[in-house]
Amino acid sequence: MEPPDTLRRVRVLVVTNFEPDASTPQRGRWVRDQVEEMRRQGAEVEVFSFPPGKRHYAPATRRLRSLLRQQHFDLVHAHYGLAGWCARLAGARPLIVSFHGTDVRHSVVGPMSRRLAWRVDLVAAVSRALFAAEDGRPGLPAVPGSAVLPCGPDLGRFRSIPRAEARRQLSLDPQRPYLLFPADPARPEKRHDRAAELASACGVELLRGGSIEPDEMPLWVNAANAVLVTSDYEGFGLACLEALACDVPALSTPVGIAPFALAGLPGALCAPFDLDAWSAAARPLLEDPDPRVEGASRAAPLSAARMAERTLEAYRDVLGVID
């Protein structure tokens, strides 16, 4: 008889300040996808979420402290550095904190995250790159036992859909070429200006993320001739993998997972942003009525289900050490 899975006998609390709102419904969907995957794999996981913004941190810490006094959780997993500080100050232990990118590279939040890294039971980053400096921005400290725990794409949602069908559902012109910038244009590190410059140079319409409902995002990806990741930096770069999961070409700066995921893939580009080079890569895709790449096989090893398995293994390790 197989031994019972220890995670069926523990309760995990996930803490996140990635709570979505009407203007950014996609925010934090990657955390929610991972939670759902962990539940499907047998773990009992509850979620404590609150909106981003400095006015929310003190009230959230008080509410979290009260929750931890009223209910027992065997492990707390916070996503994003400031949410991690809330959990730490609320007395959460054992505590895992996953750092996602901006919380490491930001000039104000980054130093706070590096201090927090020495005060938790497991430091997790969504990519190895976050442990190294990048363009003068420090990374996370090399805390012994640190882990890499990304949140991967939900392959149940992000899959290849006929481009004509995606455009029909979105009421987009079936004949026109489109580029998709899937991020929120208001986030400066995502560099919407680069995507807009490229679309203008190629004479095509740029579709923009930010206010797209999460369940509709796979339609927008499949409707586009190519997905643009023009960021200055990414923790993991989930948009690149979501495009690949749909077999849609991705053009990306060398950030996050892109150098690994796009290496040697025909129809894709991973290079520093240069208008001439990117235009040359984009034009053949814009001239093709249905450009596709062999991307799904590259996204599969990093799927939400696979990354949930990896995260549950990290929980087992932490609970084994603490116990």
Task: Set out the residue ranges of the language-model regions.
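Conserved donor-binding/catalytic core segment of Leloir-type glycosyltransferases
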Residues: 13, 173-190, 196-200
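A charged, aromatic-enriched C-terminal amphipathic alpha-helix characteristic of glycosyltransferases
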Residues: 26-29, 273, 287-319
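Short His-centered aromatic/hydrophobic patch
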Residues: 78-83
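Short alpha-helical donor nucleotide-sugar binding micro-motif in glycosyltransferases
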Residues: 117, 219-224
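A short, active-site helix/loop in glycosyltransferases that binds the activated sugar's phosphate group
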Residues: 118-146, 153-160, 311
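Aromatic "clamp/platform" in nucleotide-sugar-dependent glycosyltransferases that forms part
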Residues: 232
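Short hydrophobic beta-strand element within catalytic cores of glycosyltransferases
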Residues: 249-252, 259
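Conserved acidic donor-binding segment of nucleotide-sugar-dependent glycosyltransferases
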Residues: 264-276, 283-289
